[in-house]
């Protein structure tokens, strides 16, 4: 079942009827991360806020776990959807533990021992040792630490859906990269359905299973990062994702995109070939070929499956022609 479904969603604002979204239709699979990317005014945040009914659609249908959000009580709906924003929104008069558990306290039905155990579990999850951080106040935290607390608060009630509106946009480049890595790690553990707004195409390519490219309220393309880089639907998408940027392709396309089906094998005296994870980047694969001077890399596969290979020639071909 899709985690989130948009069907012909449109939105007009004000008496002038300004069209912010026009006939947007797509699905976000359960447990996946979908990045909404586009320039300012593309409709990304408007679309995201419709999921928890902070904004109502003018027309169309939005389903969460198969149920229309318009059939749900807005307050009850929001209690089951995590929400993380750029400004974090921590209460300055509350310590870290109080900030995290506030959503569960509002929902009710949690004992104090259960609240405390869940807070400690989430602090461990976001990389903040509870003994050191649970009694600190927001003013005593760095920007990155505040965002970790904000993420922990959004996960407090274990929601199936997580909405993230440019959560790392105000962080410096180093902290931003660290938070992106942390989110990838956390998502591998919790497997939430994530809808994430960003202006940063590299952030979108790094974090997303799917990337939805928005432009002037329309959905231009929905696809995996490799699809956008190698098969953009039009020039607007191509310019936005930088589909002619070879360095970007090396960093974000995976080795599995560059399988060399014509490789016949190394000479018997060449020794065993080095191995490569299918999700390693093309850059990692290319550097491994240079370091080892091997004629090919073996793509790791489950037992019993035939060996697949990546060569320097297949990497170059992929960059020139696009992933198969």
Task: Report each predicted region and the residues it spans.
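Helix-to-loop junction immediately C-terminal to a conserved catalytic motif
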Residues: 52
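ABC ATPase NBD coupling module
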Residues: 68-82, 106, 112-113, 231-232
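ABC ATPase "signature
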Residues: 222-223, 231, 309
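A short, proline-enriched helix->beta-strand linker immediately N-terminal to the Walker B motif
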Residues: 156-160
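Conserved ABC ATPase "signature" region
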Residues: 113-132
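Short helical segment in ABC ATPase nucleotide-binding domains corresponding to the A-loop/adjacent helical element
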Residues: 97-106, 116, 120
